[in-house]
Amino acid sequence: MSRIAALPDHLVNQIAAGEVVERPANALKEIVENSIDAGATAIDVELAGGGIRLIRVSDNGGGIHPDDIELALHRHATSKIKTLNDLEHVASMGFRGEGLASIASVSRLTLTSRQEDSSHATQVKAEDGKLSSPTAAAHPVGTTIEAAELFFNTPARRKFLKSEATEYAHCATMLERLALAHPHIAFSLKRDGKQVFKLPAQSLHERIAAIVGDDFQTASLEIDSDNGALRLYGAIAKPTFAKGKTDKQYCFVNHRFVRDKVMLHAVKQAYRDVLHNALTPAFVLFLDLPPEAVDVNVHPTKTEIRFRDSQQVHQLVFHTLNKALADTRADLTESVSNAGEVLHDITGVTPAPMPSENNSENLFDRASNYPTGNKSDTHNAFGSSGKTAPMPYQSAYAPQQRSLSLRESRAAMNTYAELYKKTDDIDLELSRFEQARFGNMPSETPAPQTDTPLSDGIPSPSELPPLGFAIAQLLGIYILAQAEDSLLLIDMHAAAERVNYEKMKRQRQENGNLQSQRLLIPVTFAASHEECAALADHAEALAGFGLELSDMGGNTLAVRAAPAMLGKSDVVSLARDVLNEFAQVGSSQTIEEHENHILATMSCHGSIRAGRRLTLPEMNALLRDMENTPRSNQCNHGRPTWVKLTLKELDALFLRGQ
């Protein structure tokens, strides 16, 4: 039987390297974090062969004392902690003393360093666990570490590496995360001798734009809030910027990139009302908290952490993001979709841009002068205006034309004749609506006939509400509205769905339940066994949502009351869908956790359906509701509720100004 024996140090280091250094990107992270801890203000990185053949990191930090340079390559040797209390309050990026020792055990490593008060630098080399004697070398103040031929002495490990291009991509991503977390440090990267990027020390906003991209910059909302000793800040993308990938999700805790389930769950919960299907949000979040409130000593790579009070962190992240997203009302933000981009997606041709004018004021800049309710203080974090050169005539968008058949022409004429036929009732209703909503508008009583131009009766641009006034209903689906300098298209069902949903949520929060209205005659329907079981299990909870159902026996249910807010909705279809939602609530979920999904289902039933003809006052009432409703830029499923076509885009379609 074999005897127990202590493993040699070089073998221990190679085993430890399996946890710390999985690939070149991990080695790069350990070295760069040492440079950050050394107080460097400039860090230069060179990679060869994707980091497999060479990783070279140079910094201008404080350097290593000549007497400590050999010790720096030994296991568990560090200057950052000395006691257990230091470990509990550690604020540095590294503290284990394992990184350099692990890298030195699986590569040919050269360490050169010089402190400011030293006349020359000191250099030491390590290969296969063996250290050379320190020698004098020429080097500016700071440190340079070269790790060559990674895993040269562990061929089995090297076989698990991917291609050089893939390993380089991981290294570049790792360096971008570190650069994003430390914008006050200048970073540069060279790949096989070619400069990839060179970032100067800059502000956080500038660094986010440089790393995450201009598209994120223009579609982001700035956040900054605190809760006691915790502070959360950064930028989150508007819901329409959401993608199917998670490559633009960054969480930093005390400037350390982490993958934390608590924070990610809070982000997901905040976006759940405004994201469509499987899309994921983009964000850059920084959480600062006392070092003793978080345990970073969970995993050797330090990307997994543990909060002392995870509930406090979750609440801060959720409420901060939820408030920022709730403030994306139609009176505060631009359209969630740009009509010019939509035209490009459909036709493949970009409309010719118009020459820029001096008056480039945003459509909603005057919204504060219009009585649409309380405004939020949330602003776009990175506003910018880009100018593009006019397109040549040949490439400008030309609308496709086709003749209508006689049947199509008659159908269209009949539709619009019926919709816009003049009646005294509609004229009186419209004038009353405008008088009630806008006191400064023309009164109901006709003014004496004069020679004053007709345009004098039209509201001035400063009097227009953010979403303007409805002028038509298109195809029974969309509302066409005119604002100050643009036309707006509103999906009436999607908009009404969001308005009803937010009203229901507010009513549930204020009263604890939805107001119900009893039916004069109960409506019965044949139910499945699952629907009957859901009623038996959740009858009281259903009543809280304004639905009163009773079991008539023989798999027959009767609807006796429905939510008053939903009006003339199909109560049977509503009851079936809500029962199905309740049936899906498993033992791991409560009704409260599933509440918003149930309310979203109910609001869909009570919203305007396609094909329903609306009067102008009804259309305008919906627009005003949108201006006062949180998250009204998206419906409950995350789809946009309105788009804008500016005057410049309209002119470009007709080649005006070419």
From Swiss-Prot:
InterPro entries: DNA_mismatch_repair_CS, DNA_mismatch_repair_MutL, DNA_mismatch_S5_2-like, HATPase_C_sf, MutL/Mlh/PMS, MutL/Mlh/Pms-like, MutL_C, MutL_C_dimsub. Residues 114-137 are annotated as: Disordered. GO terms for molecular function: ATP binding; ATP hydrolysis activity; ATP-dependent DNA damage sensor activity; mismatched DNA binding. Residues 114-130 have a biased composition (Basic and acidic residues). Keywords: DNA damage, DNA repair. CDD domains: HATPase_MutL-MLH-PMS-like (cd16926), MutL_Trans_MutL (cd03482). Pfam families: DNA_mis_repair (PF01119), HATPase_c_3 (PF13589), MutL_C (PF08676). GO terms for cellular component: mismatch repair complex. GO terms for biological process: mismatch repair. Belongs to the DNA mismatch repair MutL/HexB family. This protein is involved in the repair of mismatches in DNA. It is required for dam-dependent methyl-directed DNA mismatch repair. May act as a 'molecular matchmaker', a protein that promotes the formation of a stable complex between two or more DNA-binding proteins in an ATP-dependent manner without itself being part of a final effector complex. This is DNA mismatch repair protein MutL. It comes from Neisseria meningitidis serogroup C / serotype 2a (strain ATCC 700532 / DSM 15464 / FAM18).
